[in-house]
Amino acid sequence: MSGLIWDITERKIAEEQQALLAREVDHRAKNALAVVQAALRLTKASSLPEYIAVMEGRVSALARAQTLLARDRWSGADLRTLLDGELAPFLGSGQRALLDGPAVMLPAHTAQPLAMTLHELATNAVKYGALSSEAGHVSVTWTVEEMPSGVMLRLRWTEVGGPPLSSPPRRMGFGSRVLEGTIRS
């Protein structure tokens, strides 16, 4: 009598890891698509070309966050790198943004909402705020505070040199909803 025994433990572990990775990718893809769907529904524009431009900017912000997360294998995202990526399309070659704060690795689940928030702030600064004026600039500072419930990131977006604010906004647009949702989480 003879027999042959194969230890398939390593293969089973690899299969389980592959299945876990597939579920994680599926989950992240569904989350990203949900964000795109919300942006499609909530984006307002006066013309189709304007709508397309706004949506391309929002999808690009989401893609930049995805790329940053994938580069670090979804372990998190460096805040300064995220800020650089979101501000670069709006700043041109001039020194129009000051970034100041400690090194912060954002948890993966916060990188995309924060990227969308920063994109909306930068877009509004270009349209209505400091970056709509040649003399204007943006300052983004942040600190990290230890709280009983965990660590809290305090991020301050300050615009200087923009046009005076004539009146408060009349409606809550997609950007405001993104900001509100990000702040709550």
Q: What are the language-model segments listed below?
A:
Residues 6-17:
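PAS-associated C-terminal cap
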Residues 17-22, 91-138, 170:
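Conserved short strand/loop->alpha-helix "switch" segment adjacent to the catalytic nucleotide/phosphoryl-transfer site
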Residues 20-34, 38, 42:
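Conserved phosphoacceptor histidine of two-component systems
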Residues 53-64, 68, 75-92, 141-143:
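Short beta-to-alpha transition helix within the HATPase_c
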Residues 135-149:
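Short beta-strand/loop element within the Bergerat-fold HATPase_c
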Residues 152, 165-185:
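ATP phosphate-binding glycine-rich loop and adjacent ATP-lid/helix-beta elements
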